[in-house]
Amino acid sequence: MVTVVENIDPKIKPVPAVIKELEEKYAGKFVVQHTVDEIPTVWVARADLLDVLLFLRKLPKPYVMLFDLSAIDERLRQHRQGLPESDFTVFYHLMSLERNSDVRIKVALSEEDLNVPSATQIWPNANWYEREVWDMFGIVFTGHPHLTRILLPKYWEGHPLRKEYHARATEFTPYFLNTAKQQYEQENLRFVPEEWGMKRSGRDEDFMFLNIGPNHPSAHGAFRLVLQLDGEEVVDCIPDIGYHHRGAEKMAERQTWHSFIPYTDRIDYLGGVMNELPYIMSVEKLAGITIPPRAETIRVMMSEFFRITNNLLFVGTFIQDAGGMTPVFYMFTDRQKAYDVIEAVTGYRMHPAWFRIGGTAHDLPRGWQRLVREFLDWMPKRLDEYVKAALQNSVLKGRTQGVAQYNTKQALAWGVTGAGLRATGLDFDLRKARPYMGYENYDFEVPVGYNGDAYDRCMVKVEEMRQSLRIIRQCMDNMPQGPYKADHPLAVPPPKDRTLNDIETLINHFISVSWGPVMPAGECTTIVEATKGLNSYYITSDKATMSYRTRIRTPTFAHLQQMPSVINGSLVSDAIMYLASIDVVMADCDR
């Protein structure tokens, strides 16, 4: 075993158990990299990759979930001293719930030989992640069952997350769309069953191929679902994503650490400041910033407000998709009351871009307690009414109980997190399992279901709102005094009043707000329990004013990939309720 220290002093910390287990099996065959996030990170040879992954998957306390899989173009990276030589690096982020720990496996590739074996036989959810890596980097996964583009159309040229690929529209030749090109692009949308291994007919029947979307109210966004039908029964289905792709990870490479914050709001556009939290926390870890208790508490309170607004919309549209048209309008009244508080605190509603590196944009306004207290007094009885009037309705139960059902083992294999995982009976909530932002100081419960069906997923979301109300009340009652931003040279923006003292502070302020701060070189992942499941930002800094690589892992991407395994053999109406029950936001999926 070779150890490489990156940016931090490992101090004499005990060697993680997984590293010891790997050492016993693969002594001398891997390199350990110490990263800022302290996730055990191991470089292995391509020839050993599948063997190592399978070993980790079959340990006594196994790494059952492939949490993330992506790549980094290393060719322009300056600060990677001591790391294995690599033009492109593929990384696998694995998670063990029994150990409550993660491990990161890396494989170095040369530009002349961008091939790596597929992991789809070990984790089924590797399928989409590997397709995305091929789409964005051009890395080939040998043995993949269907290695095609996934976020970009099939006629796209190039691989956008390579460093030579332009990041701004002004760097490209002018775009034009004539009739011939439009027809060509439309023709490329034609679904060809044979390309997906589907048959057009069975022994005694012809199958129907039905498009749902990309513009359909039940799709909950720009999303296309192709169904192979035998009457009303779904024989197979192909989720087609990418219509909402905006290149968020590429944008992060051209924005300063501070100016990228508004882009995070638009990943899950219903999550508000919840989107900002994992990004901000990763940057703060890189910079070594410890935020004050008041800033922590404010962040928790506002994050839980957005959890409530998200879940209200989810429950309302869930009931609507089952045929109940009225509750969603009542829930918009509740959301408006929540947004009144959010707007009073942040100045904005859905996309406040309010968290800052080191704290928040400003302090809480005068009278904030009254607004929060009024909402806390209003909301519980409304939830009781929705449960009694709509969610206990026998028609809704008939449409959702036992529908789109899966168990804990299946959920973990597909990378399902959040309410979708807890509805199977597993009480895994990152706020409890790995507390961050002081969540260990709050008294709240983790709602779980038992059947893993559409109905349980909805009821878990309802109970989540009750727990969020408990957390918000504790924030209000125990709000610390003190500053709302850290006193740190890399906090952005820096204190303006100090610019009046001397020329040095004036220069530092000017550089920080114009060019942006220079973050130390290193790598850091932060995961949070977001509105739809686990959301993470894996940031690579090359000691510059902007990120070298920003990987955004979102829950919706994983949840949609699971769809065929859940609904094949069910009815079309069950497919609609599955989509309604997993809290889909396509911007969260496509990034």
Curated annotation (Swiss-Prot):
Species for this entry: Psychrobacter arcticus (strain DSM 17307 / VKM B-2377 / 273-4)
An MF annotation (GO) of this entry: NADH dehydrogenase (ubiquinone) activity
Region listing for NADH dehydrogenase I subunit D, in residue ranges: 206-591
Domain of life the protein comes from: Bacteria
EC number(s) stated in the UniProt entry for this protein: 7.1.1.-
NADH dehydrogenase I subunit C: region residues: 1-182
Stated name of the protein: NADH-quinone oxidoreductase subunit C/D
Lineage: Bacteria, Pseudomonadati, Pseudomonadota, Gammaproteobacteria, Moraxellales
Reactions mediated catalytically: a quinone + NADH + 5 H(+)(in) = a quinol + NAD(+) + 4 H(+)(out)
Location (main, coarse): membrane
Function description: NDH-1 shuttles electrons from NADH, via FMN and iron-sulfur (Fe-S) centers, to quinones in the respiratory chain. The immediate electron acceptor for the enzyme in this species is believed to be ubiquinone. Couples the redox reaction to proton translocation (for every two electrons transferred, four hydrogen ions are translocated across the cytoplasmic membrane), and thus conserves the redox energy in a proton gradient.
Entry's family note: In the N-terminal section; belongs to the complex I 30 kDa subunit family. In the C-terminal section; belongs to the complex I 49 kDa subunit family.
